[in-house]
Amino acid sequence: MIQISDKAQTYFRKLIEREGVPGMGVRLSAVDAGTPRADARLEFAEPADLSGDEWAIDCDGFTLYVVAASVPWMDGAEIDYVTQSTGNQQLTIKAPKIKGEAPAESASMVERVRWVVENEINPQLASHGGRVAVQEVSAEGVVLLRFGGGCHGCGMADVTLKQGIEKTLMGRVPGVTAVRDATDHATGDAPYIPRDSAA
């Protein structure tokens, strides 16, 4: 079920009225659903733009059309028009299932480690232009990672590994015993913090 607040409905209705196109609605879809890059897309939709298999949700003065393939990813979504602390108003979409769900405890350790790396660790590292890739997960629970982007050659990679990544993986994936770095940091060509200046 998708919830759309009264404020969001009023916001959309005013935008649609301004367009002046009979039958215009709003189409909601999931982009890259089930991945860390997943996002929700809202766009105007004229009747001719619709494929006919969308789910239609009647709103106050317009219809919200949900692309059929996106319906499972949008279950539980909330669309609102909120006032931020700065006084600005902003449309917000919360879609808790859009990036997929964490693997079950019965999933392999490799699947669970990869999910945490892709959905929790890499989004944080991306703020520095960095990322990590899982190279191997041993039977003993040792995770071997390769740093890339701004983390490749970074003078703070050891701190990131021990205080950030290892803590996160050991706390979120039962069975992980250690996290090791397999990166040749001397070959990094654009580190966020050069190794010789991290002291």
Curated annotation (Swiss-Prot):
Q: How does it assemble?
A: Homodimer.
Q: Where, in this chain's numbering, is [4Fe-4S] cluster bound?
A: 151, 154
UniProt xrefs under HAMAP family: Fe_S_biogen_NfuA
Q: Which family does it belong to?
A: Belongs to the NfuA family.
Enumerate the Gene Ontology biological process terms. Answer: iron-sulfur cluster assembly; protein maturation
Tell me the GO molecular function terms. Answer: 4 iron, 4 sulfur cluster binding; iron ion binding
- Cofactor(s) the protein needs: [4Fe-4S] cluster
Q: Does the keyword 4Fe-4S apply?
A: yes
Q: What does this protein do?
A: Involved in iron-sulfur cluster biogenesis. Binds a 4Fe-4S cluster, can transfer this cluster to apoproteins, and thereby intervenes in the maturation of Fe/S proteins. Could also act as a scaffold/chaperone for damaged Fe/S proteins.
One Pfam family name is NifU
Coiled coil ranges (UniProt) are none
Specify the protein name: Fe/S biogenesis protein NfuA
Q: Which SUPFAM superfamilies match?
A: Fe-S cluster assembly (FSCA) domain-like, HesB-like domain
Q: Which UniProt keywords apply?
A: 4Fe-4S, Iron, Iron-sulfur, Metal-binding
Q: Which Gene3D superfamilies match?
A: Fe-S cluster assembly (FSCA), HesB-like domain
| Annotated cofactor note | Binds 1 [4Fe-4S] cluster per subunit. The cluster is presumably bound at the interface of two monomers.
**What InterPro entries has UniProt attached to this entry?**
Fe/S_biogenesis_protein_NfuA, FSCA_dom_sf, HesB-like_dom_sf, NIF_FeS_clus_asmbl_NifU_C
